[in-house]
């Protein structure tokens, strides 16, 4: 039986699980303290999580400043990848940005991360530039992608 995934706002009690996903997804993961800071002290930060079968399967962070939104991080737990959960989560993030009256949405993605770029292109995101040597673990460039979401 296929169960539906549910997206909700991230809570403090989710941080341990979110950190596990972060650490398994990125070579230079954010710290747990960074997530606490985001939820408790950053007025621009909005975090969503996606659950499947009662388990936290992924998360997405967004900063919304005036009419500009930026995805700070998005990740799906390795064992849940390939189930369209990233697409569901990203769609929810875009909807949140629209609700908050953001006009533009941007993000950075590794130039080598073609699967993620493909997902973002499904939502109309287009390449907008390169940040040279953006990633500190290996000096890889970041591709800046953006889309207008509210006109």
UniProtKB/Swiss-Prot annotation:
CDD domains: NAT_SF
The entry's keywords: Acyltransferase, Cytoplasm, Transferase
Keyword Acyltransferase in annotation: yes
Annotated acetyl-CoA binding sites: 74-76, 113
Pfam families in alphabetical order: Acetyltransf_1
Keyword Protein biosynthesis listed: no
Membrane-crossing segments per the record: none
Gene3D superfamilies: 3.40.630.30
UniProt enzyme class: transferase
Primary location group: cytoplasm
One term of GO molecular function: protein-N-terminal-alanine acetyltransferase activity
Domain of life: Bacteria
Gene Ontology cellular component annotations, sorted alphabetically: cytoplasm
Catalytic activity line of the entry: N-terminal L-alanyl-[ribosomal protein bS18] + acetyl-CoA = N-terminal N(alpha)-acetyl-L-alanyl-[ribosomal protein bS18] + CoA + H(+)
Domain N-acetyltransferase as annotated: residue spans: 5-150
Family listed: Belongs to the acetyltransferase family. RimI subfamily.
General function of this protein: Acetylates the N-terminal alanine of ribosomal protein bS18.
Protein name: Putative [ribosomal protein bS18]-alanine N-acetyltransferase
Phylogenetic classification of the source organism: Bacteria, Bacillati, Bacillota, Bacilli, Bacillales
């Amino acid at each position: 039986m296929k169960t539906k995934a549910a997206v909700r706002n991230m809570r403090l009690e989710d941080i341990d699980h979110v950190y596990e996903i972060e650490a398994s997804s990125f070579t230079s993961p954010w710290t747990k303290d960074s997530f606490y800071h985001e939820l408790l002290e950053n007025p621009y930060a909005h975090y969503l999580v996606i659950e499947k079968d009662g388990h936290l399967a992924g998360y997405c962070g967004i900063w919304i400043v005036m009419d500009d939104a930026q995805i700070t991080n998005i990740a799906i737990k390795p064992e849940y990848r390939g189930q369209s959960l990233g697409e569901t989560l990203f769609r929810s993030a875009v909807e949140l940005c629209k609700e908050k009256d953001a006009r533009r949405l941007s993000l950075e993605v590794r130039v080598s991360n073609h699967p993620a770029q493909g997902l973002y292109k499904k939502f109309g995101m287009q390449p907008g530039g390169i940040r040279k040597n953006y990633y500190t673990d290996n000096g890889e460039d970041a591709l800046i992608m953006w889309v207008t979401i509210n006109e």
